[in-house]
Design a protein with these regions (language model features):
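A structural signal for multi-pass alpha-helical bundles of membrane permease subunits
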Residues: 1-253
Length: 253
């Protein structure tokens, strides 16, 4: 399972002249950091764009998904079950189908080749998932906690902000991580909606090294290594919260 990671690291340290050796070296005999120097020289703007889009997606997703999940879990509006079904179906729509629909809409709105356009597009994937996670988690919050807040005079908004959100840390971390990783690794929306713009994320920046007659594989793999680090670090740091957030609501007392 870890072989692709090992091979990615191996190729990122292999000199260009050794790329076509047959059989290939299992370890780089003459390691070089040329690929990583290329990343620092060429890819930092793309990494910055990916970070901006990822954080923007997280913020927009939380702003929309947390209140919606609270409403479905605690306020139980009319048609809430149907809305949950719609959100589930939305998760099944292929990304390329949504990208083609977004292209026409964004063309009319002037959102093509913009970072905020990609934030909106990526959020359409993260928000339905976030609503389902928040709904499941907030359904498990003891009703006595909500009732106590109401007795103390808190309205619906105050209860949500001061009581429900503070105890929903696991769900917030889970949804934030999913939204960030989706936006960070997205290629379909980026290539369709921002293929020729100045705000290209790292998933498109890697193509800087690929041409008809030239493939700088050590730079490509070095870029992949650097781009994988934020995702790996976040997963390691947040795995405890993710496990709790995903399983919340699955087991009832």
């Amino acid at each position: 399972m870890l072989f692709p990671v090992y091979w990615m690291l191996n190729v990122s340290l292999t000199p260009q002249q050794d790329m076509r050796k047959s059989p290939p070296d299992l370890l780089p005999l003459h390691p070089t950091f040329e690929g990583y120097r290329a990343v620092l020289n060429d890819q930092l703007p793309y990494l910055g764009t990916s970070l901006l889009i990822g954080l923007g997606t997280v913020v927009l997703t939380l702003l929309l998904a947390a209140p919606a999940g609270f409403a479905l879990a605690r306020l139980r509006p009319y048609g809430g079950g149907l809305l949950g079904l719609v959100l589930l179906i939305a998760q099944m729509i292929p990304g390329i189908v949504m990208a083609m629909g977004f292209y026409g809409i964004f063309l009319d709105l002037g959102l093509l080749n913009s970072w905020w356009g990609l934030i909106i597009a990526d959020s359409t994937i993260a928000v339905p998932f976030g609503v389902m996670i928040f709904t499941a988690f907030m359904s498990g919050i003891p009703g006595e906690l909500i009732a106590a807040a109401r007795i103390d005079g808190a309205g619906t908004l105050r209860t949500f902000l001061s009581v429900v959100l503070p105890v929903s840390r696991n769900a917030i971390v889970t949804v934030s991580l999913f939204g960030f990783l989706w936006a960070w690794s997205d290629f379909v929306f980026a290539n369709t909606l921002d293929g020729g713009g100045d705000w290209r994320p790292i998933t498109l920046g890697i193509y800087h090294y690929i041409g008809n007659n030239n493939q700088e594989w050590n730079a490509i793999m070095a870029t992949a290594v650097v781009a994988s680090l934020p995702a790996a670090i976040l997963l390691v740091l947040a795995q405890r919260y993710v496990a709790a957030g995903v399983t919340a609501g699955a087991v009832k007392d």
